[in-house]
Amino acid sequence: MNKLALYCRPGFEKEVAAEITDQASHLGVFGFARVQDNSGYVIFECYQPDEADRLARDIPFNRLIFARQMIVISDLLEDLDPADRISPIVAAFEELSQQVNFAQSSELFVETADTNEAKELSTFCRKFTVPLRQALKKQGWLSAKASQKCGQFLHCFFVKPNCCYVGYSYVDNHSSHFMGIPRLKFPADAPSRSTLKLEEAILTFIPRKEENKRLNENMIGVDLGACPGGWTYQLVKRGLFVYAVDHGKMAANLHDTGRIEHCAEDGFKFQPPKRKKVDWLVCDMVEQPSRISSLIGKWLLNGWCRETIFNLKLPMKKRYQEVILCLENLAVMLAEQNLNFEIQAKHLYHDREEITVHIALKP
């Protein structure tokens, strides 16, 4: 067990490779990443046996920016017989189970990468899931409750119709979504599809049990670069009153809620109204990431907001390095003022050439 598979958006394999290499080295684990451009996944192979399992336990998954999922995997199973794919797959799981007790496993995902080529396998994967699940249950696996906070999900990751990896992820340190992708429905009354970015960000960064406490009708939000209102929509839906800052027009149905004030101003120059306590700042402006991170830092340092979600548009080259630089600069700015804070960042499914960042100031 010396390999990890990490899923990602196609085109971001090099960023995942750089990130997992960095994270592993911080734990004293060394290896190399196998990268195929636009494949939608990366294989990280550790030099020492059993270290992939350690990484899957000890690298906080919510701290990985570019990976959608992290699983410990077998060697590639090749040339599977179409008449009996299940037997060698079960045998591979049995080999893994010599090191990890699958009695606590609760779910099976038969997956592919998020590419057009791999999606041609999606129908097969869906049909293959039922017989494979039955075969694994005969081994005494997949019997735990899905709601438990320990144990594993089992994964069968097909890269071709006759080639797959088998593996597992830890329930307390993975994405619970199939293929690492949350399935969100576009609201019919939302002004733009960008609304799904903020919805996914809230689901990713804010624990469900805390959402009503941290986003509610007693709060005020500011949306910089708000037009036509995709992000404002998500705040208003949760009851916030929102100052929507943009020279462009906002959607009429948002005005109809009585929960927004349109401020036709430059997002970089806008300041919150005096005597108004702003709880949330959101920002999805197309601008250099260093300029956006400086703007967010100004809001936090001035005490203009307590919590923020914003996008950083990525450059064409050195994307991982630019992200780390921006996040480190923000952390230094806040630490120098003795502020207690938490930073999270993720390349969300609904992001493209950008990442989404969440910062919360703590008491």
Curated annotation (Swiss-Prot):
Active site residues per record: 313 (proton acceptor)
Coiled-coil annotated residue ranges, if any: none
SUPFAM superfamilies named in the record: S-adenosyl-L-methionine-dependent methyltransferases
Pfam family, one: RlmM_FDX
GO molecular-function term, one example from the UniProt record: S-adenosylmethionine-dependent methyltransferase activity
Subcellular location: Cytoplasm
Gene Ontology cellular-component terms listed: cytoplasm
Keyword tags: Cytoplasm, Methyltransferase, rRNA processing, S-adenosyl-L-methionine, Transferase
InterPro entries: RlmM_FDX, RlmM_THUMP-like, RNA_MeTrfase_FtsJ_dom, rRNA_MeTrfase_M, SAM-dependent_MTases_sf
Enzyme class: transferase
Enzyme Commission numbers on file: 2.1.1.186
Domain of life: Bacteria
Role description: Catalyzes the 2'-O-methylation at nucleotide C2498 in 23S rRNA.
Family matches, as HAMAP family: 23SrRNA_methyltr_M
Family: Belongs to the class I-like SAM-binding methyltransferase superfamily. RNA methyltransferase RlmE family. RlmM subfamily.
Subunit organization: Monomer.
Protein's UniProt name: Ribosomal RNA large subunit methyltransferase M
Protein species of origin: Haemophilus influenzae (strain PittGG)
